[in-house]
Design a protein with these regions (language model features):
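Juxtamembrane intracellular "pre-TM" segments in multi-pass secondary transporters
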Residues: 1-13, 189-227
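Helix-loop boundary and gating motifs at the non-cytosolic
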Residues: 9-59, 221-261
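Residue-level signature of mid-helix packing/kink "hotspots" within the transmembrane helices
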Residues: 31, 59-67, 151-152, 265-273, ...
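Helix-breaking motifs and short loop linkers at transmembrane-helix boundaries and internal kinks
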Residues: 45, 77, 98-103, 305-307
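Helix-to-loop junctions at the C-terminal end of transmembrane segments
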Residues: 65-77, 271-284
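Structural signature of the two symmetry-related core transmembrane helices
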Residues: 80-94, 287-301
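Cytoplasmic helix-loop-helix junction between adjacent transmembrane helices
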Residues: 108-147
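C-terminal membrane-cytosol helix-exit motif in multi-pass small-molecule transporters
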Residues: 176-197, 391-396
Length: 411
């Protein structure tokens, strides 16, 4: 594996910029999921354990959704799969917003999970197909930053709309999905030609070449990256899901979680130019990941001791800076590990880390906060990140020894 430090601005194709902008629009309403558990408790009268179970059901449904997304991208094309996922999400979110009881909300949550991850593998594969290996870390970091900017707007929207009723958050989310679908439909190429995984280039002697199909499940490098990615995804999902519950447990307005996440995004955007400083741009992947997880550990440890909204701001800036250093690196490595034409399937398997985390996070958040309190949850998250600050660099070195994967810094 070769780590190439990008010391100058890296241009990415227009297709990547358009996709990032469309996903940012989609993300404007995406904060509704952070309030799914709270809404079921406050609006539909569910217990915290029941609401956590329904949220876990949503997360469980995202696991096959991610795999279906990878397969559909190969068969239907990337753009069609993205559109199917976005419209499916919008329909399910409107169902949650209008649900008269817990049973209907649970069914709609499961349907939302089945549609929720359909568009991720084709989105990530579209970036891999449109960029050179040296551009990928920057391209995936651009997508991450665009989603973060959308999250900042989502946090402000959640803080404003949430005071009028939690159901309205899901209506806004549905509208953002449809707006994103419109941009994708009008501005991105169809991608509905025969995918690269089905093309058979001629052999050097002019004859037909037999295409070797490589199963992602048999690649130990991918499985190791997925295991590490699951830990990061779990911590991130716990922040998203547990923050409103933590605020509520400490007597604060759970809708204020939107302001906290907006502060996290502001930190991510404002500090991003730091990545272009030669000293930072020259960091190896191992050092950047180790430092990133260490900063996340410090920030989440600060959450354990914060008891006011203002007290959460400094820890939020710290863990968000750590997230910035991690941004885009794992996706670039996974995309580079994939054989030609297999990027969607590799990224779909790696993306299962988010499905697993989405299942586990609501259950852990409700159980730990309900029985031990918010401080125990945030302390546990800090310990996980501290451990990953050692594990992730070791994993990166292992992949380096076995592969030649160019990974540029996310400058």
């Amino acid at each position: 594996m070769t780590i190439v430090a990008a010391r100058r601005h890296v241009e990415v194709p227009r297709q990547v910029r358009v996709l990032a902008a469309a996903r940012a629009v989609n993300q404007l309403g995406a904060f509704s999921l952070a309030f799914l558990t709270v809404m079921m408790c406050r609006v539909l009268g569910a217990s915290m354990a029941t609401a956590g179970a329904v949220s876990a059901l949503f997360g469980l449904a995202t696991i096959p959704s991610r795999l279906f997304g990878g397969r559909l991208a190969d068969r239907l094309g990337q753009r069609r799969t993205i559109l199917a996922g976005l419209t499916g999400c919008a329909a399910a979110q409107l169902g949650i917003a209008a649900a008269p009881n817990l049973a209907v909300a649970a069914v709609c949550a499961a349907l939302l999970g089945l549609a929720f991850e359909l568009y991720e593998p084709p989105s990530q594969a579209m970036i891999a197909d449109a960029t050179e290996p040296s551009q990928r870390t920057h391209a995936y970091a651009l997508l991450t930053t665009a989603l973060a900017v959308g999250n900042m707007g989502a946090g402000l929207i959640a803080n404003a709309v949430g005071h009028s009723g939690l159901r309205w958050l899901f209506v806004v989310d549905a509208a953002s999905c449809l707006a994103c679908a419109l941009i994708v439909r009008l501005a991105l190429p169809s991608g509905d030609r025969r995918p690269a995984s089905q093309l058979q280039p001629p052999s050097p002697d002019g004859g037909l070449r037999v295409r070797l199909v490589v199963s992602p499940w048999r690649d130990p490098r991918l499985l190791a990256m997925t295991a590490a990615g699951t830990i990061f995804a779990l911590v991130y999902m716990l922040i998203l899901v547990a923050l409103p519950l933590s605020l509520s447990a400490r007597g604060l307005n759970p809708a204020s979680a939107g302001l906290v996440m907006a502060a996290a995004t502001l930190t991510l955007v404002v500090t991003r130019p730091v990545l272009r400083i030669p000293l930072v741009a020259g960091l190896s992947g191992q050092v950047a990941c180790g430092t990133g997880f260490a900063l996340m550990a410090a920030g989440l440890a600060g959450y354990a001791t914060a008891h006011s909204l203002s007290g959460l701001l400094a820890p939020t800036a710290v863990w968000s800076a750590g997230n910035l250093l991690l941004s885009g690196r794992a996706f670039a490595v996974v995309a580079a590990l994939a054989p030609p034409g297999a990027a969607a399937r590799y990224l779909a398997v790696y993306g299962l880390s988010w499905g697993i985390a989405t299942v586990a996070a609501p259950v852990l958040a409700t159980q730990v906060i309900g029985s031990l309190g918010p401080a125990a949850l945030w302390s546990g998250c800090a310990v996980l990140c501290a451990a990953m600050s050692c594990v992730q660099p070791a994993l990166m070195r292992g992949v380096m020894r076995r592969s030649q994967v160019p990974v540029a810094s996310a400058s």
